[in-house]
Amino acid sequence: MQNITQSWFVQGMIKATTDAWLKGWDERNGGNLTLRLDDADIAPYHGNFHAQPRYIPLSQPMPLLANTPFIVTGSGKFFRNVQLDPAANLGVVKVDSDGAGYHILWGLTNEAVPTSELPAHFLSHCERIKATNGKDRVIMHCHATNLIALTYVLENDTAVFTRQLWEGSTECLVVFPDGVGILPWMVPGTDEIGQATAQEMQKHSLVLWPFHGVFGSGPTLDETFGLIDTAEKSAQVLVKVYSMGGMKQTISREELIALGQRFGVTPLASALAL
């Protein structure tokens, strides 16, 4: 019998959660991560599944995700511990045939449950499936330090925030030309913040929760981690620049346009217009 802990998706989750912990983005039980799988991914590991998978209803049906398996982080679990005990901190779940709930097929031992942000993740998965024709498979939420810091000093406006991040590091416009969506402050772990995040995910692969953290979406764990890492690096540069008295010079609008043309991306118009 093949061991599911050696599968590409469990190993990928171990690496992503460990890297995020080492970055300082996921203190205590902060942050959560979900990866959409296919039946073929989990088929070799049926022998590892729970004999009687627990069923948990969703707070609202999500028929678009019917019969879809995911690997998810657990509620109250520490990213730093995933590498030590994957089965206690991760779980493979599968949405039922009508999208009304899911079974926990593997992991989340000792009656653990998926992340409290699962509604936000699943709603965002639905929107990114539609926005990318199924290409995006990962939703990652973390507490990226410098991005959070900027939400206290920059106007929490998509165009303003996006433009500052683009100017903070040349690669940013290439990596996230669609800009950064921003919510008002909202109570986490609710359907309301999940719906608001998903609405922004229709237009942006990055969504900021002011004074809290960031949501990122991408086709792979590496791409999604790299997306957040790129934005966070720019935020780190900006924090240093603002601490030194602000910008004396920066990347101009004309240079941003040239950058987009060189790499074949279309920058968010509202950010470019500032």
Swiss-Prot record:
| UniProt cross-references to Pfam families, sorted A to Z | Aldolase_II
Q: In which pathway does this enzyme or protein participate?
A: Carbohydrate degradation; L-rhamnose degradation; glycerone phosphate from L-rhamnose: step 3/3
GO MF, one annotated term: rhamnulose-1-phosphate aldolase activity
* Cellular component terms (Gene Ontology): cytosol
Any idea of its EC number? Answer: 4.1.2.19
Q: Which NCBIfam families match?
A: PRK03634.1, rhamnu_1P_ald
Q: Which family does it belong to?
A: Belongs to the aldolase class II family. RhaD subfamily.
Name this protein carries in UniProt: Rhamnulose-1-phosphate aldolase
The protein's gene is named rhaD
